[in-house]
C-alpha cells in the first residue's frame, strides 16, 4: 500500500511506525548492518547483502537529517515549553483545587447530616 493512498486517520500510526523503525535502525551500529561473512553461494546471503546495500544509505541519510531532533536542544526546548504551559502554576492550582474540594465535601456532609445531630449554631 502506498503512503499517498492511505487514509488520513491512518497517517499518525504509519508515521509513528516509521519513526520507531528509523530510530531503532539508527541506534544500531554500522558494524551490525554490514553483512556477516558466510557462504557466498547461498541465495539468502545474496538477498540479505542486497537489502543491506539498499537500506544502509537510507539509514545514514535519515540519521544525518534527524540528528537535530536527538540533540539536547530540541528536548530541552520541548521540556521548557511544556513546563511553562502546564506545570508552572501547578502549586497554586493544586492548593485552590484542594480548598474547593474540602469546602464542597464539608457542605455536602453538612447537608446530609440529620438536624438532631448537627444543630445549627445559630439556634443555640
Curated annotation (Swiss-Prot):
Q: In which organism is this protein found? A: Mus musculus
| Sites where a glycan is attached | 107
Q: What does this protein do?
A: May participate in lipoprotein metabolism.
> From which domain of life does this come?
Eukaryota
The question of whether Coiled coil is a record keyword is answered with no
Quote the InterPro entries the UniProt record gives: APOC4 (IPR028120)
User: What gene is it encoded by?
Assistant: Apoc4
Q: Which GO terms describe its cellular component?
A: extracellular region; high-density lipoprotein particle; very-low-density lipoprotein particle
Q: What is its main location?
A: secreted
Record-level GO BP terms: lipid storage; lipid transport; triglyceride homeostasis
Its keywords, alphabetically, are: Glycoprotein, Lipid transport, Secreted, Signal, Transport
Q: In which tissues is it expressed?
A: Expressed by the liver and secreted in plasma.
Q: Where in the cell is it found?
A: Secreted
Similarity field: Belongs to the apolipoprotein C4 family.
Mind telling me what this protein is named?
Answer: Apolipoprotein C-IV
One Pfam family in the UniProt entry: APOC4
Per the UniProt entry, the signal peptide is: 1-27
